[in-house]
């Protein structure tokens, strides 16, 4: 499904340079096809804002080549911003009220770095709640990544995340628990997904509220779950969108904080991430005591095997295909005629 460059955005230019198909508005308007309008609520901090745009744009644009995608990127108040990044947002991001007026077929919520143990204390909490409530009544499906899943589960179901003894950080194996779910059709029954989080929500917490767990791992716990109907809200506790170097950059960031005395101990290596040669390289660097300016990031990036990308593409392709099947032809209406909003996949009445 090609992306449509309906607004000027640096991330689209980067993807075009990488060889991804990007349609201009003139060419897109000549194709007699129902486009999909996907909202991307980007809550990520400044350092990861643009990279997160590209990660989700790649997954959307690579899903298939039938429909057209207009991706509407927006954010909400409450996330600390530098003056330069706020200027970028003001120039390139869209306004939620305008999007709510025009309508969206689906929304992706990114994660972010929380500042408080209780998510309700975050400055962006009431603004995110407003988007959740609107989407619940107007959007075919909402897909949440990592911290966004915790926000949604606390808002809709009163489920509070729990602090882990240590950070879950690395790439972990998972197993599909519900092979009949259409989002999991024709994908590997066991696959990898990156995780990077201090907190989690357990299968027991979800099942107690009637929320089906779709994918889970022995080390990582729940990777994917959904709202009781199976589709209106999709929750990932991991990061299927991550690039090859995402965990590497997080490790470098935390190592720099440790060297600056802002963390009490050095970060642990991401689990199941580096090749044996990469693990030796990074241990040699740490033992040498060299400054962060000498961190061998480029060399380490070559020592990462990407084991999650194909499954991530398949998951997003299945999700977007279902959105395309279920959404109304008018973008401001939630479902096509005959679809039960309480059971859009028709699984509950079987």
Swiss-Prot record:
Superkingdom of the source species: Bacteria
GO cellular component, one term: cytoplasm
Predominant subcellular localization, coarse grouping: cytoplasm
Site feature location: Important for substrate specificity: 196
Active site per UniProt: 146, 239, 241
Keywords, comma-separated and alphabetical: Acyltransferase, Amino-acid biosynthesis, Cytoplasm, Methionine biosynthesis, Transferase
Transferase in keyword set: yes
Pathway: Amino-acid biosynthesis; L-methionine biosynthesis via de novo pathway; O-succinyl-L-homoserine from L-homoserine: step 1/1
Matching HAMAP family: MetA_acyltransf
Function as written in the Swiss-Prot or TrEMBL entry: Transfers a succinyl group from succinyl-CoA to L-homoserine, forming succinyl-L-homoserine.
NCBIfam families in UniProt: PRK05368.1-3
Protein name, as recorded: Homoserine O-succinyltransferase
UniProt source species: Cardiobacterium hominis (strain ATCC 15826 / DSM 8339 / NCTC 10426 / 6573)
